């Protein structure tokens, strides 16, 4: 499945909530949800009764669009989670949170996950002193994340522009030196992505 290249604000409207896909614009009055809080399309304002399948599909799409992951990679991540011990849904979200592009976003080093993914692709970040250009790279406790010296200027601009709170407790960030450490694996209560992971488990288990 090809990556979606259309207006990302339509994705937020499709699921009826902010997915924060456009960075600082999502926190401004220009946000599409603030202006047109209904589904895109001719029948967007019509009342709609969703089937059980549609409810689960919507929840899956909400998570996939939030993290900016293609379907094939999203399903592969779910397969990894289902083979692990413990709660499959919580493990699935943990694996998504550990993606390097998501970690860069959580640290406030980028204003959106899409921007973080692009910057990782372009080799602007290093893990344990080695440049990493794979957005899906999974960080582990003890990993040190740094910004490449030539990339510091625009990362600082992103920090100033972003309205993100402090990094989650499983990450330790020094926004002055643009360095961070992964302190632990993320727990379910550390993840604020607004999804019901049980519905995603049910979708892939049908």
Curated annotation (Swiss-Prot):
GO terms for cellular component: small ribosomal subunit. One of the primary rRNA binding proteins, it binds directly to 16S rRNA where it nucleates assembly of the body of the 30S subunit. With S5 and S12 plays an important role in translational accuracy. GO terms for molecular function: rRNA binding; structural constituent of ribosome. Belongs to the universal ribosomal protein uS4 family. Part of the 30S ribosomal subunit. Contacts protein S5. The interaction surface between S4 and S5 is involved in control of translational fidelity. HAMAP family: Ribosomal_uS4_B. It holds the Pfam family S4. The gene is rpsD. The keyword Ribosomal protein applies. Keywords: Ribonucleoprotein, Ribosomal protein, RNA-binding, rRNA-binding. It comes from Gloeobacter violaceus (strain ATCC 29082 / PCC 7421). CDD domains: S4. Disulfide bonds: none annotated. The keyword Ribonucleoprotein applies. InterPro entries: Ribosomal_uS4 (IPR022801), Ribosomal_uS4_bac-type (IPR005709), Ribosomal_uS4_N (IPR001912), S4_RNA-bd (IPR002942), S4_RNA-bd_sf (IPR036986). The lineage of its organism: Bacteria, Bacillati, Cyanobacteriota, Cyanophyceae, Gloeobacterales. It comes from the Bacteria. Residues 98-176 form the S4 RNA-binding domain. One of its GO terms (biological process) is translation. This is Small ribosomal subunit protein uS4.
